[in-house]
Amino acid sequence: MLTMVSLARFIINTASFNKSIYPLSQVYVKIHLSHKYNHILFTYNMRIYLIKRNHMLFTHMLISCN
């Protein structure tokens, strides 16, 4: 089971947006408690991203850049 910290690190290490990211403490992760953590919503630099699990891999999609 992924912890919040390991999940945030995974997001940081795999995201393809700006690599000059904030420290881990400034990355806000919210897990939607669906079955087996299928959906993960997090914000980075005023952007909202949705992580969806797809065949045991997480892919990320930009939802909003407001």
Curated annotation (Swiss-Prot):
A GO CC term assigned to this protein in UniProt: host cell endoplasmic reticulum
Q: Where is the signal peptide?
A: none
What species was this sequence derived from? African swine fever virus (strain Badajoz 1971 Vero-adapted)
Q: What does this protein do?
A: Inhibits host protein translation, probably through the EIF2AK2/EIF2S1 signaling pathway. Promotes cell retention in the G0/G1 phase.
What name does the UniProt record give this protein? Host translation inhibitor E66L
- Record's keyword terms, sorted: Eukaryotic host gene expression shutoff by virus, Eukaryotic host translation shutoff by virus, G0/G1 host cell cycle checkpoint dysregulation by virus, Host endoplasmic reticulum, Host gene expression shutoff by virus, Host-virus interaction, Modulation of host cell cycle by virus
Q: Name one GO biological process term.
A: symbiont-mediated perturbation of host cell cycle G0/G1 transition checkpoint
Name the family. Belongs to the asfivirus E66L family.
Q: Where in the cell is it found?
A: Host endoplasmic reticulum
Q: Where is this region: Involved in the inhibition of host protein synthesis?
A: 13-34
